[in-house]
């Protein structure tokens, strides 16, 4: 069903909560997806972050389902949740028909007032799985296909007495380029099913909520943030490339003249860097940069796959977050590599 029409007929809101992890590869970044997932699933700090969030949800009276792609991860997370819920049910696609039947019978017989957590593989809760009590989804391992997002989120969208808000917790491993890219792709999936998007009834205040915008809707909110800027702006993008200079160039020039610190980081050079140099703005090149974002006053973060200084596809998305800790983490990532070099700055061209 169309997300907006479905939401109009439901009493609960849909909330996306991104959780940025500290996980990073110790060895080479050139690992396959399978290798990365295997390593991530065994990371103690990351698993503890997930379990702490699940625990809080249970304390709030919520009914969580934790999704992962590995059977071993299901077992480990379920074991960690046991102290916090009266019932912890595991659902694994590889289980026998008998095991699946027993698990579903257990679910059907759990009183709605008893605390419950489900830990499952994504394949298990595809089409056909129905448990209306669920109101909180924890995406414990990265995926990118938006069809999976719609399918998984759909498990939360069944009407149930007392359901006022459904949440999805997404664990984003921003220090792993492949995982960072996959999360940016997931934003499109979340937007398509009504998570973190602007309300059509006009009631949403985009300066207070964390929202997902597309290439046609982000500019009003982004420029309002720039008007309120007090100290600094860091932009990270793939390249500075356009046919006509965007409004942002003149806006950056005005901010610079008002004493705002500005730095633009790029992955590819050889396009329109000189326009920013002429405006007096530092441009810093780093050939392994993967993150696309804008960080305002080290607290407001615009993060996604929209290039603020270049071309964008119609279905590009960006998410606005107000979180100083995440903003600081991204600044550390952007500045951490010694291979960066300043191409242009306010006093001279091509350093």
Where are these regions (language model features)?
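Post-DEXD/H (motif II) to motif III coupling segment of the RecA-like Helicase ATP-binding lobe
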Residues: 1-14, 190
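Short, basic/glycine-rich phosphate-binding loops at helix/coil junctions
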Residues: 14-36, 81-85
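C-terminal helicase lobe
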Residues: 28, 35, 160-204
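Conserved interdomain hinge at the start of the Helicase C-terminal
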Residues: 28-69, 76-80
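Conserved helicase ATPase core of P-loop NTP-dependent helicases/translocases
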Residues: 75-76, 86-125
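A short beta-strand element within the Helicase C-terminal
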Residues: 118-119, 127-142, 151, 167-170, ...
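Conserved SF2 helicase motif VI
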Residues: 144-168
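PLD/PLD-like phosphodiesterase catalytic module centered on the HKD motif
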Residues: 203-351
């Amino acid at each position: 069903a169309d997300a907006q029409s479905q939401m109009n007929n439901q009493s609960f809101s849909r909330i996306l909560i991104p959780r940025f992890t500290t996980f990073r590869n110790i060895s080479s970044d050139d690992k396959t997806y399978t290798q990365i997932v295997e390593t991530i699933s065994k990371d103690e700090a990351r698993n503890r972050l997930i379990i702490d969030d699940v625990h809080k949800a249970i304390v709030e009276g919520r009914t969580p389902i934790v999704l992962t792609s590995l059977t071993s991860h299901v077992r480990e997370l379920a074991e960690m949740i046991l102290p916090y819920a009266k019932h912890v049910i595991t659902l694994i696609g590889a289980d026998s028909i008998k095991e699946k039947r027993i698990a579903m019978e257990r679910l059907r017989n759990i009183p709605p007032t008893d605390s419950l957590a489900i830990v499952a593989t994504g394949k298990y809760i595809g089409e056909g799985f129905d448990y209306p009590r669920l109101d909180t989804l924890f995406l414990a391992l990265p995926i990118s296909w938006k069809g999976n997002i719609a399918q998984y989120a759909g498990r939360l969208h069944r009407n149930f007495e007392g359901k006022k808000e459904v949440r999805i917790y997404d664990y984003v491993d921003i220090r792993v380029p492949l995982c960072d890219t996959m999360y940016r792709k997931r934003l499109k999936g979340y937007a398509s099913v009504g998570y973190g998007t602007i309300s059509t009834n006009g009631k949403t205040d985009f300066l207070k909520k964390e929202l997902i915008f597309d290439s046609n809707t982000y500019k009003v909110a982004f420029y309002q943030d720039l008007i309120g800027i007090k100290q600094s702006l860091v932009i990270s993008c793939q390249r500075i490339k356009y046919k006509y200079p965007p409004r942002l160039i003149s806006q950056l020039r005005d901010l610079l003249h008002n004493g705002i610190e500005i730095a633009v980081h790029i992955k590819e050079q050889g396009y329109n860097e000189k326009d920013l140099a002429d405006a007096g703005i530092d441009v810093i090149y780093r050939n392994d940069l993967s993150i696309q974002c804008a960080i305002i006053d080290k607290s407001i973060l615009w993060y996604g796959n929209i290039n603020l200084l270049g071309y964008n596809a119609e279905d590009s998305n960006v998410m606005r977050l107000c979180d100083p800790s995440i903003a600081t983490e991204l600044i550390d990532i952007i500045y951490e590599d010694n291979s960066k070099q300043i191409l242009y700055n306010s006093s001279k061209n091509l350093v």
